Amino acid sequence: NGAFDYITKGDDNNKIIPLISRAMEKARTNGVKNRPEKETFQQYSFNSILGQSKPLLEAIALARKVASTDVPVLLTGETGTGKEVFAQAIHHESKRNKGNFVAINCSAFSKELLESEIFGHKAGSFTGALKDKKGLFEEAHNGTIFLDEIGEMAIELQAKLLRVLETGEYIKIGETKPTSVNVRIIAATNRNLPEEINAGHFREDLFYRLSVFQIHLPPLRERPGDIRLLTEAFVQSLSEKMTHSSKTVSKAFIDML
């Protein structure tokens, strides 16, 4: 919604890196602010997931089943199939729904930044670490952490994540003492993780820990019967936002889609 700060030509990393860290911290803090409980439940419940096709309803049924447990969940499917929507619904219909739901896309960060974002760091632990920083695991304590595109995570960080799953502990960058955490992990990927394991890019032990309960989300091309329902819902939502009267969608337009 605007500029956070600015840099000038010639600024070095000693200024740029802390500035980026502060901007990311503010964005993340804004992202975990609590919404009104009623609004949150309506927006993120399974009832908000639109579709009537058999593959989608089967995925929803599985997700409802696992929501009442506390086991890790692995969501698989192509980009755009709604993996984060499912993760939010699982969280908000679980016993952890009073805690935070925090999410991160593992493909959006370098290994070093991703480690800092997830596990946090102590001041002075590396260049630009001017103050202590909470990691997402700390933010998600007693709640749920969603690790999107887990297949992009560096193999070194996979070992730290495995430790959390095995012991409920992690070590911040710059610390030697482990921190205990009570958090549910939901991961998602658009990759074929068994193939990544064979290629040496993903840990087999981590895969089995994450995939205690695995749900595959079908792409829209495999559920064409949902196209009209989704289109009408999007048109209705846009009409309300633009304060227009409700619009209808022609059969010819749906057939084209």
Predicted regions and their residues:
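Loop/turn-to-beta-strand initiation segments
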Residues: H141-T144, K160, V181-I186, R203
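Receiver (REC) domain switch/active-site region of two-component response regulators
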Residues: D12, S21, P55, N105, ...
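Nucleotide-binding/hydrolysis machinery
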Residues: P18, A27-R28, S94-G99, G174-R184, ...
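Conserved post-Walker A coupling segment in P-loop NTPases
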Residues: D11, S48, L62-T127, E138-A154, ...
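Conserved RecA-like P-loop NTPase ATPase core
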Residues: P36, A59, T81, I104, ...
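Conserved two-component signaling phosphotransfer/partner-docking surface
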Residues: T8-I17, R22, K111, E115, ...
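Flexible nucleotide-interacting loop at or near the entrance of a catalytic core
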Residues: K9-E78
